[in-house]
Amino acid sequence: MLAIISPAKTLDFESAVPKFEFSQPQLTEYSAQLIDVCRQLSPAEIGSLMSISDKLAGLNFARFAEWQKAHTEQNSRAAIYAFKGDVYTGLDVESLSQQDVLFAQQHLRMLSGLYGLLKPLDLMQPYRLEMGTKLVNSKGKDLYAFWGNVITDTLQQAIEAQGDNVLVNLASDEYYKSVKESQLNVRIIKPVFLDNKNGKYKVISFYAKKARGLMCRYIIQNRLSEVEQLKGFDLGGYWFDPTSSSETEFVFKRDVAE
């Protein structure tokens, strides 16, 4: 079983990280091509392209300039410890054991606009490049055109290494669009998280993002290997609703936010 999640815009390159044998990102040849494109942009162009403030545009202009193809523990950080956001709040990697993180290294992947696909312990340098960014490049008008089949092929290899051909899609639509689902030889399960608001169950973005992280945590800590085991997810007060679910979409509901 392999789970995929989105990255986060907020990064942490300051706090202490446990000692691990870190891995290298697999697709840096492609990352370097994107960096070359981004280095041609002025801070103002970066701000306009990404709809961010002048301050953030300046920061990312500097990040693109400083990015190096060689990833070391001096200039990089393991992806699972670098991303901070709602999904990663739910995952709460800091409280996972070393064995949990090593399990995640085999069973979790993060989609990325710059790196394509990351393993949890892959070293990455600070960047901001969301998958939906309309960055014109040699392959086309945006990052979906740039990545083409690369992410899908890399993901297929990772799934085959699991031996059970099951993909749990916990990524946002923006990022999952980079995966060509029809080309994957795999059973795909999409968990959906609904919260009760005024008597109706609906997706509430903040809660749903955190729940995706909680589901990752559940898979990791319980060493899940069977699709049916996903239905036992009960973190944060969620429960599996079989009547709203299908073969491919597992619906989890919650009445009161915890």
Swiss-Prot record:
GO cellular component, one term: cytosol
GO annotation, biological process: response to hydroperoxide
Source domain of life: Bacteria
Family to which this protein belongs: Belongs to the UPF0246 family.
HAMAP family: UPF0246 (MF_00652)
Protein name, UniProt field: UPF0246 protein PM0066
